[in-house]
């Protein structure tokens, strides 16, 4: 048993999820995958009802229902998320409660692409999911193969419309329900789908391989040694002697060298993504660095004031606003570790935004912030979270 434990950790880890229109079979497919892989000793079979009764979670103050299942193929370990309701799915994507490296788009061959199919593809594009594999479900209910071909073409066109490689995206046809009921042919289809996912969705770059970045949470002075910035390393690694830049909240970028590194009050040789560390900085005084800035590998991140965001606006029940907002609304945007006031401009044709809406708008921040596409933020008003978003485009 102990050996197996060790083996499991050596497989590369990938996060995926099922997306698509309501009742097209996302949860049935999730259950079928666990059942078929369980028969090979690679998963624990999860019941449809268990997946569907997803527990509530809080992410950045927003309540989301999400089911998490895990399973393995010969090559990889997967964490798979399935969000039962459409609103849950939207919230999941935007808050980053479930970071997806790739997604399985489930489309019922009986219906073809529906409104939420389009919406989920758009969201996947906005939040940076780069790889989509299509499962054409319920093909057993369509007598005419040409109709299935037609649906496949429609799905490919739709993916191309949102800048996915529609012509190259793998499409697998089958029946998730039949596989779940034990039909041997359809069980083979599920195994084929997993092979396709293994091959098509690349193993993500580990956070430690990316350029160093740490949002600053706190700054203090150690007498006789200098200024320490503390925080959780977001990505990359850092060691004594590394050059870093202090970026954000001002137009100036300061350079410094790391002269000491501590974790849990012990010295550290190498800090890596996920570690909470204190970084001693050469030649930096206490008033030259503040919470909300980031320490980063030189040249790896810039400040911006204007961006486009994909946003979920919380409902009154979730603790959000009770009333709509309009262009020129000026809440605080919480990035990394600090609030910055920004002015919202709604897109043409959108007069106002209601609590519960999912919307794309542009923001002009009062101060420059270290921003990049894919960065998550919350929107706050008087200390309360009223929405969550992700940077979908930089505009300056």
UniProtKB/Swiss-Prot annotation:
It comes from the Bacteria. Disulfide bonds: none annotated. Residues 137-140 are annotated as: G4. Residues 11-205 form the tr-type G domain. GO terms for cellular component: cytosol. Its main location: cytoplasm. Residues 61-65 are annotated as: G2. Mg(2+) binds at residue 27. Coiled coil: none annotated. It catalyses: GTP + H2O = GDP + phosphate + H(+). Its EC number is 3.6.5.3. Pfam families: GTP_EFTU, GTP_EFTU_D2, GTP_EFTU_D3. CDD domains: EF_Tu, EFTU_II, EFTU_III. This is Elongation factor Tu. It comes from Limosilactobacillus reuteri (strain DSM 20016).
């Amino acid at each position: 048993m102990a050996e197996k434990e060790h083996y499991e950790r050596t497989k590369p880890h990938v996060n995926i999820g099922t997306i698509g229109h309501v009742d097209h079979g996302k949860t049935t497919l999730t259950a079928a995958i666990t059942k078929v892989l369980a028969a090979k000793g690679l998963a624990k079979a999860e019941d449809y009802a268990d997946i569907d009764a997803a527990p509530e979670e809080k992410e950045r103050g927003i309540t989301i229902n999400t089911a998490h299942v895990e399973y393995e193929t010969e090559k990889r370990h997967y964490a798979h998320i399935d969000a039962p309701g459409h609103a849950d799915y939207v919230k999941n994507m935007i808050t980053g409660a479930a970071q997806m490296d790739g997604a399985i788009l489930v489309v019922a061959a009986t219906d073809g692409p529906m409104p939420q199919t389009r919406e989920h593809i758009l969201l996947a594009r906005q939040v940076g999911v780069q790889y989509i594999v299509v499962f054409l479900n319920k093909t057993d209910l369509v007598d005419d193969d040409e109709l299935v071909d037609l649906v496949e073409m429609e799905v490919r066109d739709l993916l191309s419309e949102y800048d996915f490689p529609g012509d190259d995206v793998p499409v697998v046809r089958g029946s998730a329900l039949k596989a779940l009921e034990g039909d041997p042919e359809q069980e083979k289809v599920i195994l084929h789908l997993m092979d396709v996912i293994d091959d098509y969705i690349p193993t993500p770059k580990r956070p430690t391989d990316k350029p160093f970045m740490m949002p600053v949470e706190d700054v203090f002075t150690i007498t006789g040694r200098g200024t320490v910035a503390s925080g959780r390393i977001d990505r990359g690694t850092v060691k004594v002697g590394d050059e870093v830049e202090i970026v954000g909240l001002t137009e100036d970028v300061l350079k410094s060298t790391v002269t000491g590194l501590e974790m849990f009050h012990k010295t550290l040789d190498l800090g890596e993504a996920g570690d909470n560390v204190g970084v001693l900085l050469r030649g930096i005084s206490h008033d030259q660095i503040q919470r909300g800035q980031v320490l980063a590998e030189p040249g790896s991140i810039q400040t911006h004031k204007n961006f486009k965001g994909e946003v979920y606006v919380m409902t009154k029940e979730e603790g959000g606003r009770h009333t709509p907002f309009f262009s020129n609304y000026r809440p605080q945007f919480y990035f990394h570790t600090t609030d910055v006031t920004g002015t919202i401009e709604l897109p043409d044709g959108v007069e106002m935004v209601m609590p519960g809406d999912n919307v794309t708008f542009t923001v002009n921040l009062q101060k420059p912030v270290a921003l990049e596409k894919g960065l998550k933020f919350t929107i706050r008003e008087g200390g309360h979270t009223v929405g969550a978003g992700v940077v979908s485009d930089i505009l300056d």
